[in-house]
Swiss-Prot record:
CDD domains: UDG-F1-like. PROSITE patterns: U_DNA_GLYCOSYLASE (PS00130). The active site is at residue 67. The gene is ung. It comes from Borrelia turicatae (strain 91E135). Its EC number is 3.2.2.27. This is Uracil-DNA glycosylase. SMART domains: UDG, UreE_C. It is found in: Cytoplasm. Keywords: Cytoplasm, DNA damage, DNA repair, Hydrolase.
Length: 223
């Protein structure tokens, strides 16, 4: 079936788009947008924003989230990211805090992480849509099958990618990644409930920049 997505991704994922689970998923999502109008996030054109913002071959880092923010106006299709006019959520505040601590830089007080995506950071939620006020409402409808395949395709076809797995949900994806050719970084989730259990002080960002340099890749400006 025809899916509107960046061309290099369309080529890599064309096999998935033809599978029966994906067709059922698309039909379900279309019906959700039709019947619940503006209560499904992000907007339809931003569902594949993480893919549209970064061609496949340009991926240097994968940061894995669970599902989109469920507040109105927050989700923009990039994991942990919000639109620029939205207050920065607590988890993202902690991400910025760890960047500042680890890299000794000052971050921009703007929650739109498009500036990271265009440099090579693939901000992937495992579940790509959500209903307003109902976290995980689109769990087990097919998105996890799709995004698990995305992770496996990245692992198989690219080399020396950094995978940042924060929290038990993300860490559960470790088995999908070939650790012999990629760097896997694991710690607690940046949520205020768990950030002090490892995330703050993890040095994931400094480790990532060191790894990119060692493998002759252009660095990322995490400001």
């Amino acid at each position: 079936m025809e899916v509107k997505i960046e061309e290099s991704w369309k080529e890599m994922l064309k096999g998935e788009f033809c599978k029966s689970y994906f067709k059922r998923l698309v039909n379900f999502i279309k019906n959700e947008y039709k019947t619940k109008k503006d209560k499904i996030f992000p907007s339809p054109k931003l569902i594949f924003n993480a893919f549209d913002s970064l061609p496949f071959k340009d991926i240097k880092i994968v940061i894995l989230g669970q599902d989109p923010y469920h507040g109105k106006g927050q989700a923009n299709g990039l994991a942990f990211s919000v639109n620029s006019d939205i207050k920065i959520p607590p988890s993202l505040q902690n991400i910025f805090k760890e960047i500042e601590r680890s890299l000794k830089i000052k971050t921009i007080p703007n929650g739109d992480l498009t500036r990271w995506a265009t440099q090579g950071v693939f901000l992937l939620n495992s579940i790509l849509t959500v209903e307003e006020g109902r976290p995980s409402s689109h769990k087990d409808i097919g998105w996890e099958i799709f995004t698990n395949e995305v992770i496996k395709i990245i692992s198989k076809n690219l080399n020396n990618v950094v995978f940042m797995l924060w929290g038990n949900f993300a860490r559960g994806k470790k088995e999908l990644i070939d650790a012999s050719k990629h760097l896997i970084l694991e710690t607690s989730h940046p949520s205020p409930y768990s950030a002090h259990n490892g995330f703050l002080g993890s040095n994931h960002f400094s480790q990532t920049l060191k790894y990119l340099k060692e493998h002759n890749k252009i660095s990322i400006d995490f400001q």
